[in-house]
UniProtKB/Swiss-Prot annotation:
Function text: Involved in olefin biosynthesis. Catalyzes a non-decarboxylative head-to-head Claisen condensation of two acyl-CoA molecules, generating an (R)-2-alkyl-3-oxoalkanoate. Is active with fatty acyl-CoA substrates that ranged from C(8) to C(16) in length, and is the most active with palmitoyl-CoA and myristoyl-CoA.
Gene name of the encoded protein: oleA
Predominant subcellular localization, coarse grouping: cytoplasm
Active-site residues, record numbering mapped to chain: E97 (proton acceptor), C123 (acyl-thioester intermediate)
Organism: Xanthomonas campestris pv. campestris (strain ATCC 33913 / DSM 3586 / NCPPB 528 / LMG 568 / P 25)
Listed name of the protein: Acyl-CoA:acyl-CoA alkyltransferase
InterPro entries: ACP_syn_III_C, ACP_syn_III_N, Thiolase-like
Keywords assigned by UniProt, alphabetized: Acyltransferase, Cytoplasm, Manganese, Metal-binding, Transferase
GO cellular component, one term: cytoplasm
Short name of one Pfam family: ACP_syn_III_C
Length: 338
């Protein structure tokens, strides 16, 4: 869906404070590597992930999302009382219930007229949250919305490394869980608004979505374990992305050479290289953070956009493509005009 009256009033991210290097992980896994005859540095040399960030052990998803939300509200220069909708989009969550959104809302002190809920759709959820908020803004139901995401990977690292260093772990089990060691922690938040309220702010034009849910078994995760068919996930993910890109060209009028930045969901070096090659994108237009931050799930797209803003790499009028894909499989592509 395309929008005429939706803008991004504020944007912020939080980098988790602690760095865990792939070298440190490999040192712990070396006995297993030796026993299974694995000689390749899969995390560093193949995935291109040399480090990832972790929170303090007691930090929950709502804590991280709250930090990012406060920062985004400052960036937007508005008070929390103006927010009419708060959507949390994280894969990580504090509890099955209540919603993580309600905890973030309570932390922030939203007004009683503010609607709050979680949206879960693997790594695509933040863009889904933007679209839901944009629909309500476009119809005039609300003036401002806050989309948040806080990802925590500490527990999955602890439990995955316990299993992978077990003396009886098989090579199949080892490879199935290896992708869990590419995850990273981080948080992002975005304040969206009706355009007439923030006339000079970047515009969110909306976009398109396609799905291939017959592939819902390729990546399955819970709080402490993730099992992934990385090869097939890459193959089928690129196929779905190609279909989505065709739709984006038709609906948004995209021509690759006319877009100024491509904000791609950050998974790994092979995934990014496949995206760039498949669509003929100039690599100079693709900022990557997976090398030092890992895969931060649905937070990765807004974090990259926020970092581009922070670094001064976005100028008025730039056309920015948001390319998101999530396990399931679901894919969305959208445009922001800065």
């Amino acid at each position: 869906m395309l929008f005429q009256n939706v803008s991004i009033a504020g944007l912020a991210h939080i980098d988790a404070p602690h760095t865990l290097t792939s070298k440190e992980i490999n040192e712990r896994l070396q006995p297993t590597y030796d026993r299974l005859g694995i000689k390749t540095d899969v995390l560093g040399d193949v995935a291109g992930i040399h480090a990832r960030r972790l929170w303090d052990q007691d930090v929950q998803a709502s804590d991280a999302a709250t930090q990012a939300a406060r920062k985004a509200l400052i960036d937007a220069n508005i008070g929390i009382e103006k927010i009419g909708l708060l959507i949390n989009t994280s894969v990580s969550r504090d509890y099955l219930e209540p919603s993580t959104a309600s905890i973030v809302s309570g932390n922030l002190g939203v007004s009683d007229h503010c609607m709050t809920f979680d949206v879960a759709n693997a790594c695509l959820a933040f863009i889904n949250g933007m679209d839901i908020a944009a629909r309500m803004l476009e119809r005039g139901e609300i003036d401002y919305a806050l989309v948040v995401d806080g990802e925590t990977a500490n527990l999955v690292y602890e439990k995955t490394l316990e299993r992978m260093t077990s003396p009886d772990v098989t090579e199949e089990e080892f490879r199935n869980e290896l992708a869990a060691l590419t995850l990273g922690c981080g948080a992002a938040a975005m304040v969206m608004a009706r355009s007439e309220l923030v006339p000079d702010a970047p515009r969110y034009k909306g976009g398109v979505t396609r799905s291939a849910t017959e592939w819902n078994k390729l990546c399955r995760g819970n709080l402490d374990r993730m099992v992934t068919d990385t090869r097939l996930l890459l193959i089928e993910g690129i196929k779905l992305a190609q279909k989505t890109f065709v739709a984006a060209k038709q609906v948004l009028g995209w021509a690759v050479e006319e877009l100024d930045q491509f904000v791609i969901h950050q998974v790994s070096r092979p995934h990014t290289a496949a995206f760039v090659k498949s669509f003929g994108i100039d690599p100079a237009k693709v900022m990557t953070i997976f090398g030092e931050h890992g895969n931060i799930g649905p937070a990765s797209v807004p974090i990259v956009l926020s970092k581009l803003k922070e670094l001064g790499r976005l100028k008025k009028g730039d056309r920015i493509a948001l390319l998101g894909i999530g396990s399931g499989l679901n894919c969305s592509m959208a445009e922001v005009v800065w």
